Curated annotation (Swiss-Prot):
Name assigned to this protein: Ribonuclease H
One Pfam entry name: RNase_H
Entry's family note: Belongs to the RNase H family.
PANTHER family reported in the protein's UniProt record: RIBONUCLEASE H1 (PTHR10642:SF26)
Any one GO cellular component localisation term in the record: cytoplasm
Catalytic activity entry: Endonucleolytic cleavage to 5'-phosphomonoester
GO BP: any one term: DNA replication, removal of RNA primer
Organism from which the protein derives: Cronobacter sakazakii (strain ATCC BAA-894)
Cofactor: Mg(2+)
Gene that produces this protein: rnhA
Length: 158
């Protein structure tokens, strides 16, 4: 019988782009583990993705996972966009490279190991675990120690 786990995630960015962080809670029965890290220059979407990735990659066996996020970007990316991106070789409908492809590919690989139920929660609406993840993410963003090597700044028109 597969273990049933709950994951709660949030990402934060002080400026977008700017210093950012993620926070996640992984819960199995009475056991809880938290994850957080801060990056010097990143985006809120990258931090939302990292929160889900890191917590899923921490699982050592196939699990039934309920993953809660307040990110529409993550939710829509997984439930609506990713299948077509993969079919098109990680290109958008406009034939442009998918933003944050490095993280979408990591998330896709992490998801393939588990049975996932996605839950969207409204951010900053009093959901206790989401609020804790937000606190972890903001604290990490305020004391960043890591480089987000996959972050690619937008090209600006000159």
């Amino acid at each position: 019988m597969r273990k049933q786990v709950e994951i709660f995630t949030d990402g934060s960015c002080l400026g977008n782009p700017g210093p950012g962080g993620y926070g996640a809670i992984l819960r199995y029965k009475q056991h809880e583990r938290t994850f957080s890290a801060g990056y010097r220059l990143t985006t809120n979407n990258r931090m939302e993705l990292m929160a889900a990735i890191v917590s899923l990659e921490a699982l050592r066996e196939h699990c039934i996972v309920t993953l809660s996020t307040d990110s529409q970007y993550v939710r829509q990316g997984i439930t609506q966009w990713i299948h077509n991106w993969k079919k098109r070789g990680w290109k958008t409908a406009e034939k442009k490279p998918v933003k944050n492809v490095d993280l979408w590919q990591r998330l896709d690989a992490a998801l393939s190991q588990h049975e996932i139920k996605w839950e969207w929660v409204k951010g900053h609406a009093g959901h206790p675990e989401n609020e804790r993840c937000d606190e972890l993410a903001r604290a990490a963003a305020m004391a960043p120690t890591l480089e987000d090597t996959g972050y690619q700044p937008e090209a600006t028109a000159s």
